[in-house]
Structure formats: structure tokens, C-alpha cells
């Protein structure tokens, strides 16, 4: 990050006017007094220096701030200010996405929204302390939503507000609990979620057990297949009555099926577990559950939509490799939130700044008109 004053003015122009930042910071409780830090823009600048700025400690940030006449305060004072500013940084990041959504809103047809989450661990490794849940638009190649929770908060398809013009796409982590899928089955948005052959309570329309392996074995070799199933509540009556869904089995090509089965055997061998023969057999297929009607979306179209899911995985990798989101420096909860939100704000700003250059193809040397 370039720390020059000219560069900061350009960055600030993408976030908001100084007086607007002052108001939002006061409303969020981030700027209760102006001693040492004169305004909200300065507080934000210090937060970005500590987060995506790459500075290794609060002491380094305060030394840089004094050297460049940004602010004069101790590392302890900065710690208190950044802890109080955590929620405000999150609000600024959310506002950046809200402006983006207003500009790039869907104009026709269904909008695809990929959803996934990633774990963030505190310094020293060990178990993850935070989980970052995010939505991603594969059309604009930009994030659309985010929510930060502790690591105990499970994945949910309904975490973000639903709209009738969207299709949510998620991996098997979202397809292991019927209540997770039910929220969209009776909601506004459609869904495509990958499932495990034993991950849900599969029922027939009559309420009898659905023979998943019989269904897979009945498919023509190398051909896709589909049927309508009922999703049971896994014995939890409070979860509601069974609901219908469209089950699609996508047959993998022989070489990819072999890779899938080899990976499955390797992972279970490493964990000291024995793979069931049925599980190994099912690994030759990708099982998708969807609410999309058959007369509007063929099985192949549903599979094509799901194949776009790699984009959000790649986006998470960019956050971790370029902004080092997985290198959390803070252990104290509020300071950790401030660090994560500052990094997200920087990532969203970078996307917005470079997006105009991606909207038009570069002009080739031979495209100039000759006079």
C-alpha cells in the first residue's frame, strides 16, 4: 500500500466524503472524542495501515503515523480506538457492497449467487476462531455479501437476504442438513446445492425410504439422470414436514471418476477410516439438489451452473494470497474484527477501482483507424 497523502486522498474519494465518514463513525460509536485522532478519515487510515497495510504490529503503525504526521498516539491508545472502530469498518465494507449492488443489479433473467465460507485462525494456529461467510456474483466476478461469525456458526443457505431473481449455488457443506435447504425451498430464491448420497434422509413421494444406490445403478453408463425426492427431517419433528426437491445425478467421465475415487480413498486412509463400497461407487457421480423446474432448466444446465462454483473458491484464495486474510495478527476479538473488516474493505475497494478497466476489452495495436 502506498502511504503518500496524494494516494490516500484518491483512496478516500472511493469511500466517502470526510463529513459523511465523521457522521457514520459517530453513529457507530467509533469516534467518541477527537483527541489524538482528529477525524474519522484518520481513524480509517490507521485501520487500513494495520490491516491490509502489511504492518506487523500496532507499535509499527503508530511509528509510521507519527513519521508521516497522520497522528501521534501510543500503541495502547491505538488498540482502544481500533477495537471501538471494528463495527464501523464492517459498516463501511457493507456500504461498499451496497453501492456496487445498486450499480450492477440484475436487469433480466436469473442471477447466480455463489455462497461459501472460510475459516480464519488467530495467531499461533490451532482451531479456527472466526468464519467468514460470503456471497459472490460470477457474472461481475465480485463479492456481493459477507458476514463474520465465530467458528461455531454453521453454514446456511439463507444467511443473506433472498430475491426472487437469484439462484444460490453451494457445495456439500450446505447440503448436509435439511433445515439448511428448507429455508430456500420455501423462500424466494432458487438453489443448487451438492449433496452426499447419505447426507440427507431421502424419501419417496409416499414417504418410504428412497433407494439412492438403486437410482444411481439404474442410470445408463455415462449418462445423467434425475428424479423427484422428498427430503425428510432426520427425526427432528420441529424441523417441519418433508419437502420435495429435484435430484440430479451427473455422471463423471471415467478419468474424473477415477480421480474422485482415488482422492476419497486417500483421505479416508489418512484418517484411518474404511470406505464403504457404496460410497466409492457413488463417487463416480456428482449429486445436485435443486428447486429449479425441469421444464425451464435441464439437468445439463443445472450442472453447468454448479460448475461455476470454483470462482468463489478462487476468490477466497486471492483474499488469502494477496491480502493475507489468513494471516490474522490479532487475538483480542474486537481488534481481530477490525483487522478482518479493514482487509475486506480494501479488497472491495480494489475490485471497484479496477472494475472499469475490465468492462471494456483493451484496444489492440491494429484497431486504430488509419486516416
From Swiss-Prot:
Cross-referenced SUPFAM superfamilies: Ribonuclease H-like
InterPro entries to which the protein is assigned, alphabetical: RNaseH-like_sf, Transpos_IS4, Transposase_11
Gene3D superfamilies registered for this protein in UniProt: Transposase Inhibitor Protein From Tn5, Chain A, domain 1 (3.90.350.10)
Keywords: DNA recombination, DNA-binding, Transposable element, Transposition
Keyword Transcription regulation: no
One biological process term in Gene Ontology: DNA transposition
Domain of life: Bacteria
Keyword Cell inner membrane annotated: no
Molecular function GO terms recorded: DNA binding; transposase activity
Pfam families on file: DDE_Tnp_1
Entries under PANTHER family matching the protein: TRANSPOSASE INSL FOR INSERTION SEQUENCE ELEMENT IS186A-RELATED
UniProt family annotation: Belongs to the transposase 11 family.
Function in brief: Involved in the transposition of the insertion sequence IS421.
NCBIfam families: transpos_IS4_1
UniProt-recorded name of the protein: Transposase for insertion sequence element IS421
Amino acid at each position: 500500500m502506498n502511504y503518500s497523502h496524494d494516494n490516500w486522498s484518491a483512496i478516500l474519494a472511493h469511500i466517502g466524503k470526510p463529513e459523511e465518514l465523521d457522521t457514520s463513525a459517530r453513529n457507530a460509536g467509533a469516534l467518541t472524542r477527537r483527541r489524538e485522532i482528529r477525524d474519522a478519515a484518520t481513524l480509517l487510515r490507521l485501520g487500513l495501515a494495520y490491516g491490509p497495510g502489511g504492518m506487523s504490529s500496532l507499535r509499527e503503525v503508530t511509528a509510521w503515523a507519527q513519521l508521516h504526521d497522520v497522528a501521534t498516539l501510543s500503541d495502547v491508545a491505538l488498540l482502544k480506538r481500533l477495537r471501538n472502530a471494528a463495527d464501523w469498518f464492517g459498516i463501511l465494507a457493507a456500504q461498499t457492497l451496497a453501492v456496487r449492488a445498486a450499480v450492477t443489479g440484475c436487469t433480466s433473467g436469473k442471477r447466480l449467487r455463489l455462497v461459501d465460507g472460510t475459516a480464519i485462525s488467530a495467531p499461533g494456529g490451532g482451531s479456527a476462531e472466526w468464519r467468514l461467510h460470503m456471497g459472490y456474483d460470477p457474472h461481475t466476478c465480485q463479492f456481493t455479501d459477507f458476514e463474520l461469525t465465530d467458528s461455531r456458526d454453521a453454514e446456511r443457505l439463507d444467511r443473506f437476504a433472498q430475491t426472487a431473481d437469484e439462484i444460490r449455488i453451494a457445495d456439500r457443506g450446505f447440503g448436509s442438513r435439511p433445515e439448511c435447504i428448507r429455508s430456500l425451498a420455501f423462500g424466494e430464491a432458487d438453489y443448487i446445492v451438492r449433496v452426499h448420497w447419505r447426507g440427507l434422509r431421502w424419501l419417496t413421494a409416499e414417504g418410504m425410504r428412497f433407494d439412492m444406490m438403486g437410482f444411481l445403478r439404474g442410470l445408463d453408463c455415462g449418462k445423467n439422470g434425475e428424479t423427484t425426492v422428498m427430503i425428510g427431517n432426520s427425526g427432528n419433528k420441529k424441523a417441519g414436514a418433508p419437502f420435495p426437491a429435484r435430484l440430479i445425478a451427473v455422471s463423471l467421465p471415467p478419468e474424473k471418476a477415477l480421480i474422485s475415487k482415488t482422492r476419497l480413498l486417500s483421505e479416508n486412509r489418512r484418517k484411518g477410516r474404511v470406505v464403504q463400497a457404496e460410497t466409492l461407487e457413488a463417487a463416480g457421480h456428482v449429486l445436485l439438489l435443486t428447486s429449479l423446474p425441469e421444464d425451464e432448466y435441464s439437468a445439463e444446465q443445472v450442472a453447468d451452473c454448479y460448475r461455476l462454483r470454483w470462482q468463489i473458491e478462487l476468490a477466497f484464495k486471492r483474499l488469502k494470497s494477496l491480502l493475507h486474510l489468513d494471516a490474522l495478527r490479532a487475538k483480542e476479538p474486537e481488534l481481530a474484527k477490525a483487522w478482518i473488516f479493514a482487509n475486506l474493505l480494501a479488497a472491495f475497494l480494489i475490485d471497484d477501482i479496477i472494475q472499469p478497466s475490465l468492462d471494456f476489452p483493451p484496444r489492440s495495436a491494429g484497431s486504430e483507424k488509419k486516416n
